[in-house]
Amino acid sequence: QKISYAIPGSSLTASWVELGPANVGGRTRGITWDPNDPTGKTVWAGGVTGGLWYNNDIANVNSSWIKVNDFWQTLSISKIIFDTINKKTAYVSTGEGFGARAGIGAGIWKTTDGGINWYKLSSTNGFLYSNDMTIRTENNKSVIYAAIDANFYMSTFSNTANVGLYRSADNGLTWTQTLPIIDSANTAKVPFAPASIQISKNNKIWVGTKASPNGNTNRGGGYILSSTNGIDWTVVKKFTVNNGYGRVSIAVAPSNANVIYAFVENNNKLENLYRSDDEGLTWVTLAKPKNYEYRTPADDFTRGQAWYDQAIAVDPNNPNTVIVGGIDLFKSTDGGTTWNQISKWYNWNAKYSYVHADQHAILYKPNSSTTALFANDGGIFYTNNLGAADTANVISHVSKAYNVTQFYAGAIHPEIGKSFFLAGSQDNGTQRFTNPSFSNTTTATGGDGGFCFIDQTNPKFQITSYVYNSYYLSSDSGKSFTQTLIDNDDIGSFINPATYDNNLHILYSNSSRDYLVRIKNITNTPKLDYISV
């Protein structure tokens, strides 16, 4: 025990200092405007593994986010909603249902004092992954609907028994699964798995589905269902999704209950965008936004990630104005006949704003056609000038002190007292830390950052990585990483395990095959070879 306490950071009385990064942000799905702020500036957001936060002046890029609590049972925030009747009451669902081996949740949290104090609803212990959540007014009462899913946790697919749409008419005390079973061909007799929930202007509730992790034959992906009472459901539409994942995100026009948009995935890719002008009786296929970003097919603006990067929202005042998000953001002002790109993540010469890749949520400010929030793998972005978004840089990154970056690995400089280390993060590159306190970082290498190393005997040599077997070398103390040691995305894992021999200056990495990748002589002339195992 005394030996373990001698390891830096292992003492029971050790004090931890938050280092950031203060300028990066991270994957976010849950965002909402605070209805209790008469100025309309307060926003709540949650990282999918970074906890719950709020910002009192979202229009100010220098306004810092404030964390609510680092010690909830889970920090995986998926959705945040305020009660439509009692605006001091809000609910936060947890667990990221979309994505493989994502952050696991632990239920739904509630506040009745506007977010000062929070407590977990014990009735939701089995709600480990949530895709969506909303509140509908029924007979002058607030009724909560939560879309509960399953996902991998520690190599086990968990929460499958609780998949479904849960309804609570008593403020979260009790819940009832309300969706019907998929169909008689599914011998498991399991309910549809909800992916998205919308409430229309006439108070009808709509659900878009995804493939259920349970059952067989027809797994229920690619459907839209509706209900007038939240209990009895009608299948409105079944899209052709080849029995794949079939995730469907729906967006009902706030100003016109007849107008509904659907964003449909099929076998990972964009299947199509659809629109109905008669409450789902008939549907027309819309044009597909054209994206000319790096490695993005012109006919699939999700770049094969529609199962994951999927967001859609309709202008509160105009049913013909709609925004969709895949890798980037696109806006249509003619009901989906034509689209204009309004963000970029890679094409720096484009005329519109930089917005981080992988869109997960789009949220208009209530009653506003010009102001909106965007949540993605880079955190939170904001604009109050949507009308100019296709021709000007009007969307800002508003993630100051929003410390939700997802790190995989780190490397510490060996020099005593030197505040320098590298850390590889999910979709935010390998970050370079140079300060002993909470501060901004700089990007050493981009994309997804994985394992990284600083040679402990000759620290001017440093290594970063991208996905699979992509490793980069710096020989100038981390100032630049211009040498590629290996770039092979056919072997290894997404975030690929690796280790470094500081004495012999050798990098070893996983290949997911019957050999290891070895790169010798890192501090001189690196040489690549393979070791059979």
Describe the predicted segments one by one.
Residues 1-533:
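Beta-propeller blade termini and top-face loops
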